[in-house]
Structures are given as structure tokens and as C-alpha cells.
Regions:
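Viral RNA-dependent RNA polymerase
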Residues: 1-560
């Protein structure tokens, strides 16, 4: 049933010390989604029931080390002015990134630059300036490099888009990429999955494969908010389901990622053309790929960790379970980018083959392959380029596809026999290598076989998925990057209606930083070492973040 008009002044969270009350601010909703009628997809899938084989789950035991160690949460100091404290911290960590008046810089460059956020209708001529209306914005409360709009010269926009989107399969030096994909997937399954996976679990998966069904769709839809459901139904007029997988919309990405080094702040922004899918085209596939993702993570042996659906606590528990390996072996980060937008035919083949190993109905893959991008034309940049089998933005298998490509490329480049332990999420990973492992050829293999430009970062402070691995006694904690948390607070142009959701996400991030009393001080030493700043006040920044996480009004005042 559904219960309305229930408001709580506070709730209790079992992970807080001594079950202290956690104050929650509940904003009244302007419009409550109350539709109890089945939508077009429920009607369309109504005759398709959930008949596939159940997912085999591994029994996961809590870390013996962590279960015996009582946690004492960090008690933060009161910071009268969190905004000023965080601004000072950011300026100390990345000097020069936030001190410039951004709108004045944009004014100086306006004559020779093109505002890529404006649609141009007409002929773009070489060596001619294009006048475009530009709305100057005021500085954010906390000035960081996370500015959502930017001016970029047309030539740089063209080159950035071409570099990101152009990757013909023959670059990967394979005459038969399908056979190469089959070889890589077979090798990965034998190395990364639980022993005898093909002879036991895989047989039941393939016997009763996962296909379209109304049960998984309703389960997925229940996790969406009212605004998303309303938008989804609006795309299906008169309850008609019509998939246009070959259709796409193009736009130039507005938010330019911040530059994390002093030298890089003077580089030109790197925009890209976003080729996106509509909500109703992804809806029937998302619920299926969620189940495949669960099977993928359950099939991995304990030494190979996918953090795609893992919380900070889950990652911390896994790190603690393998503390003996982490302490004994050397680690490397493989820093590679452009997984989803530049990888195409080989990546799509590998994910398709691996999904079939996990029990995806081949008929689903045959339908979904129409969603991949072929020829793209951008009205914004006056471009047309070909990118065979590129993944669209918003594709339902984006995270799973990235993790699959991440695992397989790292395994093949480094060698499965050299890897003692590995964790991956998106395009981030850390590998702990066995003694005597030689990874000198890894960079060349990544480039020639997988079209990835990588950097090997050995024996440094471990940084993974915007977080640090922090040792505290006999426990390893995965702690979000304080600098990244501050950076996101300075983002300008966010929808004010999302402020409550941003506060909840922000509070969860801060709770991971303060889950143990020793974390802020150890994290301070780690960040000082990685950033090369001996007097960076990380503890003071944590105190300021904790003050904001404890009070919604303070959070709202800083980010508004």
C-alpha cells in the first residue's frame, strides 16, 4: 500500500555512534507522483513473466579483522564559517584555479572564441569570428574550477571531438576482431570467474536466459523518482511503445571537467559531442542489464572486485579482507580515459560475448545493437564523423561495459599470471602485482590492442574512483577525496530542485570520511604526500564539511 502525509522530525541510523538521532529536513513536495495506472511498458511486457534461472550469489563473510574492532567516529570541531574555510583549503591545494574572475577571463576571450553552448544555424567559415550571445555568470559561493559553461575555440572543439570519437577497428591491429574478442572473453572467464563457472553456473544461465519481462521492469521503475516516471510516460503518447534505437540527439557537453593541476589550468577546455538516447529507448533494457550486472559481480572470484555497485563500506571491507596481500605486494594504478566514447567495435563484441556467458538472451543483444552510433552529424560544430558501434550517452549498459573493458584490457596488458589482486570501477583500477612481475610492455599493449592512452602509477599513494585507500590500524578504509567534495560544492548552475538529493549524497560522502576518529589525520598525511603540499589543512576542511553535513541550512547557504 501507499501511505501519505507522514513526516518525521528525526530518524535513527544504525551506523551512527550510540544510535544518536540524525536530523533530517523534509521539504514539502510541489507535485507528488501518484499514478497507480500501469505505464505503456508494463502493458507491453505484461505477458512476459520472469522465467530465467536465479542468480547464484556468493556467501560473503564480514572481515574477521573489522568485525573485532570497535569503531569510534570522528567528532568534528565547530567551524563558524565553512565557506571561507573550504575556499582557503581549495586555494591552498590548487593555487590559481579559483582566484581569477572567471567572467572577466571569458570577456577577454570572447572575440576569438566560439561559445560552444550556442546552436549555430548557418555557414561556419574559416578564419572568421562568430558572434554568439553569451550570458556572464556570477562567481559561485565557493569558487572552484567546476564551471558548467566554457568558451572554446572552434578548432579545439573540432579536434577534441574528433580525438574522442574517431577509432576505427583496424587501429587495434586485428584482422578478425570478433575472434580476438572471443579469445579475450574466454581468457577473462577462466581467470576472473569462480572455478568451473562454465561447467556449473553458466549452463543454468544459458538454459533459461534473461529476456524482457515485466517483473524486472517494475522493480527497476520503483527505484526512479516521480519526475523521471512522468518524463518516461510523456515519451509514450497514448500508451504506445515505439523504440527508435537508431535515433539520437547531439549536443555539446556544457560542463567542462576541472583541471586538477596548476599547469593544466591554462590548457584549453576539451569539449565533446554527446550522442544521447531517449528515456523510453533505454527503459526496457535497463532492468535487464541490472540483472546481468548482479550476475557479473557474483561470478567474480573474491580476489577480483567490481566496485560498480559497491558502497564505500563494501570497498573498505574488501580491502580489509585482503590486507595481507595489500601489505605484501606492490600496487599500480592504470590511468586510462575515454572508455565509453572512444571504444567501439571490439568493446561492443567483448561485452556482448560476456553478457551471453552470463545468460543474456541473444535476441536482446540483436535488438540492442541498433542503438549503437554509426554516422553522427553535429549542428553545433558543423561536423559529421563516423564512429562504428560507439556507445551513446545514457546507454543502459555504460557502467557494466566500461568495467568489462577495464578488466579485460588490464588483464591482457599486465598478464593474468602477474595479478594477485584487482579492483575496478568504470575506467579506474588498482592492481597488486606478484613478485617479479614485469609490466614494461603494458603501455604499448594498451595502446596497440585496446586504443587506450594510459599512465602506470607505481607504488604511490593509492587513489581510486575519486577516493583514497586509508590504513587505520588493521583496517583499510576507502575514503572519498576531500578536494573533490569541495570542488563539487562550487559547481554553478545546478538545478535548485535537486538540492535535497545533493544534500543526502553529500552527507553520505562526509559520513565515509568521518567513520573513524583517526581517518582525517591519516588522510591529511596521505593528501599532503600526493599533492606535494606539506602544510595543507585537510583536517580543517573535514571539520567544515562535517558542519555542513550536520545542518541542511548551512549546506544550502554555502552552495546556493
Amino acid at each position: 500500500g501507499i501511505c501519505y502525509d507522514v513526516y518525521m522530525s528525526h530518524t535513527y541510523k544504525p551506523d551512527l555512534l550510540w544510535m544518536e538521532p540524525f536530523e533530517t529536513i523534509l521539504e514539502p513536495l510541489e507535485e507528488l507522483y501518484t499514478s497507480a495506472e500501469p505505464d505503456a511498458f508494463e502493458i507491453f511486457l505484461g505477458g512476459a513473466e520472469k522465467t530465467y534461472a536465479p542468480t547464484v550469489e556468493q556467501k560473503k563473510l564480514r572481515s574477521s579483522l573489522k568485525s573485532n574492532l570497535p569503531e569510534s567516529r570522528y567528532v568534528h570541531n565547530i567551524v563558524p564559517d565553512p565557506q571561507n574555510t573550504l575556499q582557503h583549503f581549495y586555494d591552498e591545494a590548487l593555487p590559481g584555479n579559483s582566484v581569477a574572475q572567471i567572467q572577466n577571463v571569458a570577456e577577454l576571450r570572447r572575440v576569438r572564441d566560439v561559445n560552444i553552448n550556442t546552436e549555430f544555424y548557418g555557414k561556419i567559415e574559416i578564419n572568421k569570428d562568430i558572434a554568439a550571445p553569451e550570458k556572464l555568470h556570477m562567481d559561485a559561493s565557493i569558487r572552484t574550477a567546476a564551471i558548467p559553461i566554457s568558451n572554446t575555440p572552434l578548432l579545439d572543439a573540432v579536434m577534441a571531438s574528433a580525438k574522442r570519437n574517431f577509432n576505427p577497428p583496424d587501429i587495434q591491429q586485428q584482422n578478425d576482431p570478433w575472434a580476438f574478442a572471443r579469445y579475450l572473453v574466454d581468457r577473462f572467464v577462466d581467470w576472473a570467474f569462480v572455478p568451473n563457472f562454465r561447467d556449473t553456473i553458466a549452463k543454468s544461465y544459458k538454459k533459461d536466459p534473461i529476456s524482457f519481462n515485466v517483473t524486472d521492469y517494475i522493480e527497476w521503475k520503483a527505484t526512479r523518482d516521480g519526475a523521471y516516471k512522468s518524463a518516461l510516460e510523456a515519451e509514450c503518447p497514448e500508451d504506445m511503445v515505439e523504440l527508435n534505437l537508431e535515433k539520437y540527439d547531439t549536443m555539446v557537453k556544457k560542463r567542462i571537467k576541472p583541471k586538477l593541476t596548476v599547469a593544466a589550468q591554462y590548457e584549453l577546455a576539451q569539449p565533446q559531442v554527446i550522442v544521447s538516447m531517449s528515456k523510453h529507448d533505454t527503459a526496457p533494457f535497463t532492468s535487464i542489464f541490472r540483472q546481468i550486472f548482479r550476475r557479473f559481480e557474483s561470478a567474480l572470484r573474491p580476489e577480483v572486485k567490481s566496485a560498480g555497485m559497491a558502497s564505500d563500506t563494501d570497498i573498505s571491507d574488501w580491502l580489509t579482507d585482503f590486507k595481507h596481500v595489500i601489505d605484501a605486494y606492490s600496487a599500480i594504478e592504470i590511468d586510462a580515459g575515454k572508455f565509453d566514447k572512444s571504444q567501439n567495435l571490439l568493446a561492443r563484441m567483448m561485452e556482448s560475448l560476456l553478457m551471453q556467458e552470463l545468460g543474456l538472451d541473444p535476441g536482446v543483444s540483436e535488438i540492442f545493437e541498433d542503438s549503437y552510433v554509426g554516422r553522427v552529424s553535429s549542428r553545433s560544430l558543423g561536423l559529421m564523423f563516423i564512429s562504428a558501434y560507439q556507445m551513446k550517452s545514457g546507454a543502459p549498459q555504460t557502467m557494466l561495459g566500461n568495467i568489462i573493458y577495464n578488466f579485460i584490457s588490464a588483464m591482457e596488458a599486465v598478464g593474468p599470471g602477474n595479478i594477485a589482486l584487482m579492483i575496478a570501477k568504470g575506467d579506474d583500477n588498482i592492481l597488486w602485482l606478484k613478485p617479479g612481475a614485469n609490466v614494461d610492455s603494458a603501455v604499448n599493449k594498451m595502446s596497440s590492442l585496446f586504443n587506450l592512452e594510459i599512465k602506470l602509477i607505481p607504488n604511490s599513494v593509492l587513489y581510486f574512483s575519486s577516493g583514497y585507500i586509508v590504513p587505520v590500524g588493521d583496517v583499510y578504509h576507502f575514503v572519498p577525496d576531500v578536494l573533490k567534495a569541495v570542488e563539487l560544492l562550487g559547481e554553478k548552475g545546478a538545478d535548485p530542485r535537486t538540492l535535497p538529493e545533493r544534500f543526502v549524497s553529500f552527507s553520505d560522502r562526509v559520513r565515509s570520511i568521518t567513520r573513524d576518529a583517526a581517518i582525517p589525520h591519516v588522510l591529511q598525511r596521505i593528501m599532503r604526500s600526493r599533492l606535494g603540499i606539506s602544510d595543507l589543512d585537510v583536517v580543517g576542511a573535514v571539520d567544515a564539511l562535517a558542519c555542513m553535513a550536520a545542518d541542511f541550512d548551512t549546506f544550502k547557504r554555502v552552495v546556493a
